[in-house]
Amino acid sequence: MTTLNARPEAITFSAPQSALIVVDMQNAYASPGGYLDLAGFDVSATRPVIENIKTAVAAARAAGMLIIWFQNGWDDQYVEAGGPGSPNFHKSNALKTMRKRPELQGKLLAKGGWDYQLVDELVPEAGDIVLPKPRYSGFFNTPLDSLLRSRGIRHLVFTGIATNVCVESTLRDGFFLEYFGVVLEDATHQAGPEFAQKAALFNIETFFGWVSNVADFCDALNPPLARIA
């Protein structure tokens, strides 16, 4: 068993019965010229997040954890996004941006396009699972729950973008399904001002899960004394 230093208290889990979830590390959310950037959100601080996720993924993989990569988006005709009868049509900033700028139609979060692709630095490997998702939560209209339950996985460690949107939404839904959720705060980034990150982390550690960081996560999976030995 592994004990991870976290807030509000440490949490113990079995690495082989846990999953590291990488949420939406796509050009859309982490690269200049991607959807968030074009919609007016600041993506200038995402590079350290990418490096921290690389570190967390390597540690998790070495410890035998399942790695799950999410990609948020829809078909290039946006049928999966829902029409005016869906609240997603009205609240998705990607869809709103394309309505304001018709020249972007078919480019933002469209499967097969650059915006939808994972950033170059993060590459899934054999044995990882890559899941498309059509809404903020990774549990909505995806096989995530059955994939986890069939493997006996109950603990989920979250990284990715955006902390206050898709990361928090997926962790919250997991909480309602009896999963233990941990977020690595320095391997996430918010959409919006810094207070959005702080509020999301407050919600998670107070009501829905635990908050840790990449260094403590790596040390828990591979303690320094074990590395020296």
UniProtKB/Swiss-Prot annotation:
GO terms for molecular function: hydrolase activity, acting on carbon-nitrogen (but not peptide) bonds, in linear amides. The keyword rRNA-binding does not apply. It catalyses: (Z)-3-ureidoacrylate + H2O + H(+) = (Z)-3-aminoacrylate + NH4(+) + CO2; (Z)-3-ureidoacrylate + H2O = (Z)-3-aminoacrylate + carbamate + H(+); (Z)-2-methylureidoacrylate + H2O + H(+) = (Z)-2-methylaminoacrylate + NH4(+) + CO2. Keywords: Hydrolase. The keyword Lipid biosynthesis does not apply. InterPro entries: Isochorismatase-like_dom, Isochorismatase-like_hydrls, Isochorismatase-like_sf, RutB. GO terms for biological process: nitrogen utilization; uracil catabolic process. Its EC number is 3.5.1.110. The active site is at residues 24, 133, 166. Hydrolyzes ureidoacrylate to form aminoacrylate and carbamate. The carbamate hydrolyzes spontaneously, thereby releasing one of the nitrogen atoms of the pyrimidine ring as ammonia and one of its carbon atoms as CO2. HAMAP family: RutB. Belongs to the isochorismatase family. RutB subfamily. This is Ureidoacrylate amidohydrolase RutB. The gene is rutB.
